[in-house]
Swiss-Prot record:
Signal peptide location: 1-24
Main location per the UniProt record: secreted
Compartment(s): Secreted
Task of the protein: Seems to play a role in testicular function. May be a trophic hormone with a role in testicular descent in fetal life. Is a ligand for LGR8 receptor.
Gene: INSL3
Cellular component, GO annotation: extracellular space
Disulfide-linked positions: C36-C117, C48-C130, C116-C121
Propeptide residue interval(s): 61-104
Species whose genome carries this gene: Canis lupus familiaris
Tissue-specificity statement: More strongly expressed in testis than in ovary.
Domain of life, source organism: Eukaryota
Family note: Belongs to the insulin family.
GO biological process, one term: adenylate cyclase-inhibiting G protein-coupled receptor signaling pathway
GO molecular function: hormone activity
Name of the molecule in the record: Insulin-like 3
Length: 132
């Protein structure tokens, strides 16, 4: 076998291998990815693309991750509820020890950041969390 066809065969094999690796390593569009802490926040900012959360020129946005986490935890609503109607203010009540575990599990299920960390979130899941 002459060196010329062998060289072409190696070039074609290398190109095919590169394409196969590129396609194999790309996550599927609906794939779930475990996102914890700042990885969750950054993925949410990237998906939502809000001008208050991501800057075009790379400058850090005032409030940054802290503002987004507070929004996700619903802290922005606490003052509004107590100012509007005193009957709506929730008074914490002691839970019996037996139901404490179930309460924690139920709270974790409703916290999107905790859910994405434990079970993973798809891009579509993150889009449902966008405020706009």
């Amino acid at each position: 076998m002459s060196p010329r066809p062998l060289a072409w065969a190696l070039v074609l094999l290398g190109a095919a291998l590169a394409v196969a690796l590129a396609l194999g390593s790309a996550p599927a569009p609906g794939a779930r990815e475990k996102l914890c802490g700042h990885h969750f926040v950054r993925a949410l900012v990237r998906v939502c693309g809000g001008p208050r959360w991501s800057s075009e020129d790379g400058r850090r946005v005032a409030g940054g991750d802290r503002e987004l986490l507070q929004w996700l935890e619903g802290r922005h609503l606490h003052g509004q509820v107590s100012d509007g109607d005193p009957m709506l203010v929730l008074v914490p009540q002691a839970l019996p020890q037996a139901s404490l575990h179930h309460h924690h599990r139920r709270a974790a299920a409703t916290n999107p950041a905790h859910y994405c960390c434990l079970s993973g979130c798809s891009r579509q899941d993150l889009l449902t969390l966008c405020p706009h």
